């Protein structure tokens, strides 16, 4: 399974998915090639993040991913529609992948757990999912704490760019 690079989401997903028994094939780091792929394939009026995440998916598929996980649903911007548009583009390109859109539990636990069931297939167990989600949540909190700390100390460094490789 692959997913897009969105902030530090990859760190969380690289913990969550193995805990759920899902093989992870992370896309390579975002490069000029990633951007070129997304710009070439996405609608011209699509925003830059949509193009980059599409490039992530194509590179993940080329590395062997047979499943794509993408957040979706409603939200404050067009982000909620990326997944639906990207699924159509990827299908039109002839890729045979399972595209799983994960809606926020904020808008309905039933859809959220339905997405999780699709992700884990026959390995469905409330306790397993609970442990995996709790682990991923803790990792997310630690990553956010690191991010906050890096912003607090960055200005004190002679070379603030020293933190760039860490965060």
Question: PLM features: residue spans?
Answer:
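An N-terminal assembly and electron-transfer interface module characteristic of large anaerobic redox
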Residues: 1-167
């Amino acid at each position: 399974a692959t997913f897009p690079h969105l902030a530090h989401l990859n760190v969380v997903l690289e913990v969550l998915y193995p805990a759920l028994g899902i093989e992870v094939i992370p896309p390579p780091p975002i490069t000029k090639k990633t951007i070129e792929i997304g710009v070439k394939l996405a609608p011209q009026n699509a925003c830059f993040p949509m193009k980059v995440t599409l490039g992530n998916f194509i590179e993940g598929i080329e590395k062997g991913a047979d499943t794509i996980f993408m957040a979706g649903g409603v939200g404050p911007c067009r982000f909620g529609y990326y997944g639906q548009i990207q699924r159509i583009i990827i299908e039109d390109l002839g890729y045979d992948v399972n595209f799983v859109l994960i809606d926020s539990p904020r808008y309905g636990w039933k859809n959220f757990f339905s997405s999780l069931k699709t992700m884990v297939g026959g390995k469905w167990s409330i306790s397993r999912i609970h442990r995996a989600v709790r682990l991923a949540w803790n990792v997310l909190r630690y990553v956010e704490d690191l991010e906050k700390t890096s912003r607090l100390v960055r200005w004190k460094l002679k070379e603030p760019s020293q933190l760039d490789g860490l965060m």
